Amino acid sequence: MKVISSEIVISAVAPKQYPENGLPEIALAGRSNVGKSSTVNTILKRRKLARVSASPGKTRTINFYIVNNEFHIVDLPGYGYAKVSKGEKETWGKMMETYLSSRKNLYEVILLVDIRHEPTADDKMMYDWIKHYGYGSIVIATKSDKISRGAYQKHFKMIREKLGMSPEDKIIPISSLKREGIDKLWHSIEEIFIANNLPITIEEAEEY
């Protein structure tokens, strides 16, 4: 995928704020501080498009980014941060459920987990939730530069077993720091567009 343009459309807290242009959407979900904002910036080739916060749990909105004026990448609010109140957790849950259950132009929800660590109970709950709505064929393993390539398979096995992934589901290791794995992720997203006969322009990307 050649990213020619990418911009934030809106940071939404309610369905009435969601874009109404009907463009296909690919959403990213993950724990606070798993590296979602860094991943968004890297795949969209914009260093500061998504704000990278030093304080986990800051993302309280659903952020819609338009890519090449053809589709949206959607950054869902992070979860699993201990210092948020019960009320905030309930608000997060309602926001996520509303988006996942009602968005007709949503074609995939990709879960991000930290490749170094065993997925948490919250990760498992999120993955089951994503699967319930018919998504979850791709999991991104972030911060892949933090372990050796020789350890990948061991960590993939750990992630698959903890999440209960199907054999056909993919794990894509990504390093935002070294910009590794981006082409593979875009290729998998392109496959989703093609499988659904979506009119997305697919061009070979320049090196990330």
UniProtKB/Swiss-Prot annotation:
Keywords: Cell cycle, Cell division, GTP-binding, Magnesium, Metal-binding, Nucleotide-binding, Septation. GTP binds at residues 30-37, 57-61, 75-78, 142-145, 174-176. CDD domains: YihA_EngB (cd01876). Mg(2+) binds at residues 37, 59. It comes from the Bacteria. One of its GO terms (biological process) is division septum assembly. It holds the Pfam family MMR_HSR1. GO terms for cellular component: cytosol. SUPFAM superfamilies: P-loop containing nucleoside triphosphate hydrolases. The keyword Nucleotide-binding applies. One of its GO terms (molecular function) is metal ion binding. Residues 22-195 form the EngB-type G domain. Its cofactor is Mg(2+). HAMAP family: GTPase_EngB. Belongs to the TRAFAC class TrmE-Era-EngA-EngB-Septin-like GTPase superfamily. EngB GTPase family. NCBIfam families: GTPase_YsxC, small_GTP. Necessary for normal cell division and for the maintenance of normal septation. This is Probable GTP-binding protein EngB. It comes from Alkaliphilus oremlandii (strain OhILAs).
